[in-house]
Amino acid sequence: MNNALNQLQPYPFEKLRALLGSVTPNPDKRPIALSIGEPKHRSPSFVAEALANNLDQMAVYPTTLGIPALREAIAGWCERRFGVPSGWIDPARNVLPVNGTREALFAFTQTVVNRSDDALVVSPNPFYQIYEGAAFLAGAKPHYLPCLDENGFNPDFDAVSPDIWKRCQILFLCSPGNPTGALIPVDTLKKLIALADEYD
């Protein structure tokens, strides 16, 4: 059994559910759930129709990498959405459909972290819970960068020592931040890319 399992914290949404379990919302107000990012809108009709027309395929495992048409559609959307040149994103090499970000972030961390006594996974704090769990189970220690009001709720990357950067195997970033909503300035992203090149 992986000894790192003992380091895992209860998932925050379970804590939140327990805290809110005895709360009775004001009946005159509609509560706004600020927890799990589940879609609150109806699925588009073409999606519902496609699912209904393919119910006989629901018990069939998908291909490991997803069907080529899906990967091509995702690559095309990314190119349009982010303005990258056509063909820049290779659907066969750069796209992997997954069942949510937790699956992808966890698998990525297990793949790239080289277990060692000084391995660090650096993340903002507050953070998306999978960052910490993936770090522990990959044999690394989480290193938290506080997201404070005086920094616009972004980490102060200038305060990170060279020793931390040397030991950093993954830096988790999310813009807008989860859960703060803070945007990371482009100049900061460029600086972080330069640091990754320097310390890799």
Regions found by a protein language model. Give the residues of each.
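Terminal low-complexity, poorly structured segments
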Residues: M1-A4, K15, R167-Q169, K191
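Conserved core of the PLP fold type I
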Residues: A59-E198
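N-terminal small-domain helix-loop-helix segment of the aminotransferase-like
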Residues: N2, N6-G100
